[in-house]
Amino acid sequence: MTEDWLTLREKLAAAFTRFLETCEQLDPRLHEQETVDGQWSLRDIVAHFTVWDHEATERFWRFLAGPTEDITYNNDEFNARAVAARQHLSYNQAIKELNSAHKGLEEASAAVQPEDLAADGRFVEWLGALSDHYEEHTAQLKRVISQQHF
């Protein structure tokens, strides 16, 4: 199980890196304009990842502290609050905040031991979902990049 956890952590790290690399390829004029499905700017996408990484970090520390109840999230409301709360940030500030939140998630996931994984399957569930989420938005951004005209 430990090997699978390490693989999952590596998968998330790779997905996070690909996301940031893809962000760098986007025309800077689009950082704060609506770009993805006409809904969110790149800054907004970054902001929502910041909050999900922070939430995962908090959940991991709670899981490690002992039994906790499941929480059901309304993803649309959660995302809307995350984006609204960060409208005052520039794109560069949002990236800095994401890097900080992701570092916290890396630290929390590194603290998870084999016995923790055996006791609570939510660690794997969260990390897998985050990896997939980064990949999903990376693919969206790559479509935007392919449509850019320089």
Which stretches of residues belong to each language-model region?
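Short, helix-capping/interhelical loops that line the mouth of catalytic, cofactor-
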Residues: 1-7, 55-100, 104, 145-150
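Hydrophobic packing residues in well-ordered alpha-helices of helical domains and bundles
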Residues: 5-12, 16, 91-98, 123, ...
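Non-transmembrane alpha-helical segments in soluble domains
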Residues: 9, 20, 43-46, 61, ...
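Alpha-helical bundle segments that constitute or directly flank the non-heme di-iron/ferroxidase center
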Residues: 1-29, 51-62, 132
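Generic structural signal for well-ordered, non-membrane alpha-helices
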Residues: 14-17, 21-24, 54-55, 78, ...
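Short, flexible active-site loop motifs that bind/organize anionic cofactors or intermediates
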Residues: 21, 35, 84
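Short, contiguous alpha-helical
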Residues: 32-77, 114-150
